[in-house]
């Protein structure tokens, strides 16, 4: 590998490390209380109450809703092709969501909704008598007599809960499930509530984030956020510091609000125009889990006594094609890096090719190998041109050293003469690193795809159990600086291929330089890839294997005639000027 390639890779590695640490999405930290009309969404109201305050009775805390504070909870289980959900009559909320096709790190089904919470969904509002109402504190009655329901294929099933506040006011919540979909239709019907809600507004709230499912909880915590999409822009909130309280509140029409962990998302998509959104996040000391809230703020039109609001809930995997099919830009919540560089590579090249190949090849390890071969084939002309350029550069080395020695005290003249030699020999000094530079955006994009795409999750290849995480063969139990807390085998094999690739690639370096670089660069890449997804290391390993084969072929077929031609071309162009000088002396 030539010096320019080494420098390019080195700079890219440094940029990548710094970028991962410091170029995370900027978050706003709001430490001041929100206006009183918005405090109904604060879950810590009770925690901030004076210690000496006596507990409120139901009548004091719930006002006209007090009679609904007692009752018997009824759980209704809905089973479809993709998940098993539990609905509770207390709060008419979603209590549990267990996915069938996605397991946790131990290979077992897991509940995406925290069992510590009272449920994920609730309606929050401030009543006209000043009471903060969370419907999860109220007992609804179920309109269904069955405790368990099953729906398959394109069939639909509805489950409804009703709360009769008094003779003139009622609330009805209806969940509609489809047998083969993660989407749940959620209808909220308010009758006689025109004079009940302070400010004529309420919030539909998803509380508690999503339960983590991966072994590396710190990494999953890094991916967990609360988010909203409104005004054509993505609003993110990341509670990364346990000493701060994070919240965001924006007005306007929202396409959706959502909470996510590394591979799963829960999104609420309104049918009617929203008043705005509210996001909140907290993190406790010594715990990786981050607790998130996402809420849609809805306004009941003035003079309207009743309203029916319809929403779509998506609770399931962050599969690009699936979330994109909702046509609300929910795929924007997936982190593919820079929108202007790596995201287009991910969305319009990597994922489409992977999805197409997956129709014919089921093993993602093989898909990665085929993809590496395709990329190497596409870059073949560049590699050939790069090799020829390096051979010419090698032929020019004696002449360049002579000029460098001659004009060492005249930098301007030195650069002028070197430029003349490059031009007359038809050599681009940066041509050797062009293939490397071109594939870097692709490599970055693949890092994001392999790291966050659920397609690779728990898909193995040979000894690798999960291509989306490092293929650790030995865990230390402690962290080494730069290297990490484990030994991954795939990066070691990849570093070996980097070593051999350098050995057979033409270079303009001196022997001393080559000795240093041939060991330093593989070591640097080993450090860099040890904590990367094993799928990415597999791609680069196979790309290097194909590069070695390609380089061996080029070395065998591209003769040294280019070297001689380059030297002769420069010598011929230099001769006339020398002859003119000699002729001048004879005169």
Curated annotation (Swiss-Prot):
Q: Which residues does UniProt call coiled coil?
A: none
Location comes to:
Cell inner membrane
One Gene Ontology biological process: protein transport
Q: Which GO terms describe its cellular component?
A: plasma membrane
Principal subcellular localization: membrane
Q: Mind telling me which residue stretches traverse the membrane in this protein?
A: 5-25, 365-385, 430-450, 480-500, 516-536
**Keyword Transmembrane (UniProt):** yes
Keyword check for Coiled coil, yes or no.
no
- What is the topology of this protein in the membrane according to its UniProt annotation? Multi-pass membrane protein
One of the Pfam families matching this protein, by short name: YidC_periplas
Q: List the disulfide bonds.
A: none
Q: Which UniProt keywords apply?
A: Cell inner membrane, Cell membrane, Chaperone, Membrane, Protein transport, Transmembrane, Transmembrane helix, Transport
A single Gene Ontology MF term assigned here is: membrane insertase activity
Database matches in InterPro entries: Membr_insert_YidC (IPR019998), Membr_insert_YidC_N (IPR028053), YidC/ALB3/OXA1/COX18 (IPR001708), YidC/Oxa/ALB_C (IPR028055), YidC_ALB_C (IPR047196), YidC_periplasmic_sf (IPR038221)
Its subunit composition reads: Interacts with the Sec translocase complex via SecD. Specifically interacts with transmembrane segments of nascent integral membrane proteins during membrane integration.
Function recorded in the entry: Required for the insertion and/or proper folding and/or complex formation of integral membrane proteins into the membrane. Involved in integration of membrane proteins that insert both dependently and independently of the Sec translocase complex, as well as at least some lipoproteins. Aids folding of multispanning membrane proteins.
Q: Which family does it belong to?
A: Belongs to the OXA1/ALB3/YidC family. Type 1 subfamily.
Q: What name does UniProt use for this protein?
A: Membrane protein insertase YidC
């Amino acid at each position: 590998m030539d010096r320019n390639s080494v420098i390019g890779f080195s700079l890219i590695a440094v940029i990548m490390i710094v970028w991962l640490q410091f170029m995370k999405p900027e978050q706003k930290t709001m430490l001041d209380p929100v206006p009183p009309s918005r405090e109904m969404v604060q879950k810590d109201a009770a925690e901030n109450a004076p210690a000496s305050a006596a507990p409120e009775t139901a009548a004091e805390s719930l006002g006209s809703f007090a009679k609904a504070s007692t009752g018997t909870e009824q759980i209704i289980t809905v089973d479809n092709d993709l998940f098993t959900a539990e609905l509770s009559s207390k709060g008419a909320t979603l209590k549990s969501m267990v996915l069938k096709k996605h397991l946790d790190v131990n290979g077992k089904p897991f509940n995406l909704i925290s069992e510590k919470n009272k449920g994920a969904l609730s309606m929050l509002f401030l009543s006209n008598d000043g009471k903060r109402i969370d419907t999860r504190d109220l007992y609804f009655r179920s309109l269904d007599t069955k405790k368990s329901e099953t729906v398959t294929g394109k069939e639909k099933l509805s489950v409804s809960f009703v709360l009769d506040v008094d003779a003139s006011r009622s609330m009805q919540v209806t969940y509609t499930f489809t047998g083969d979909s993660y989407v749940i239709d959620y209808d909220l019907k308010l009758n006689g509530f025109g004079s009940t809600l302070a400010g004529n507004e309420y919030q539909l709230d998803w509380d508690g984030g999503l339960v983590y499912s991966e072994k590396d909880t710190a990494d999953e915590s890094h991916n967990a956020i609360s988010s909203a999409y409104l005004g054509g822009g993505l609003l993110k909130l990341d509670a990364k510091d346990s000493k701060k309280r994070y919240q965001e509140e924006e007005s306007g029409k929202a396409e959706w609000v959502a909470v996510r962990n590394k591979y799963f998302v829960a999104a609420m998509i309104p049918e009617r125009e929203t008043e705005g959104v509210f996001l909140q996040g907290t993190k406790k000391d010594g715990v990786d889990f981050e607790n998130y809230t996402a809420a849609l703020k809805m306004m009941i039109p003035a003079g309207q006594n009743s309203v029916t609001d319809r929403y779509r809930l998506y609770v399931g995997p962050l599969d690009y094609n699936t979330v994109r099919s909702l046509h609300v830009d929910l795929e924007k919540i997936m982190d593919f890096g820079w929108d202007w560089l790596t995201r287009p590579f991910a969305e319009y090249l990597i994922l489409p090719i992977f999805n197409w190949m997956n129709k014919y090849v089921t093993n993602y390890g093989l898909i990665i190998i085929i993809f590496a071969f395709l990329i190497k084939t596409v870059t073949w002309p560049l590699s050939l041109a790069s090799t020829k350029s390096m051979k010419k550069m090698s032929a020019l080395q004696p002449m360049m050293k002579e000029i460098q020695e001659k004009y060492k005290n005249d930098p301007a003249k030195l650069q002028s003469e070197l430029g003349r030699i490059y031009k007359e020999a038809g050599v681009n000094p940066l041509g050797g690193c062009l293939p490397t530079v071109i594939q870097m955006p692709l490599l970055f994009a693949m890092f994001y795809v392999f790291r966050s795409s659920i397609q690779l999750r728990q898909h193995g290849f040979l000894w690798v159990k999960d291509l989306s995480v490092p293929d650790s063969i030995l865990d230390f139990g402690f962290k080494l600086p730069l290297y990490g807390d484990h030994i991954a085998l795939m990066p070691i094999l990849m570093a070996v291929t980097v070593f051999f690739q350098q050995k057979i690639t033409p270079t303009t370096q001196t022997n001393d330089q080559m000795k240093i670089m041939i060991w330093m660069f593989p070591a640097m890449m080993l450090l860099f890839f040890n904590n990367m997804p094993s799928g990415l290391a597999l791609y680069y390993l196979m790309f290097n294997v194909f590069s070695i084969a390609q380089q061996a072929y080029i070395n065998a077929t591209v003769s040294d005639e280019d070297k001689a031609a380059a030297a002769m071309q420069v010598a011929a162009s230099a001769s006339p000027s020398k002859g003119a000088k000699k002729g001048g002396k004879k005169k």
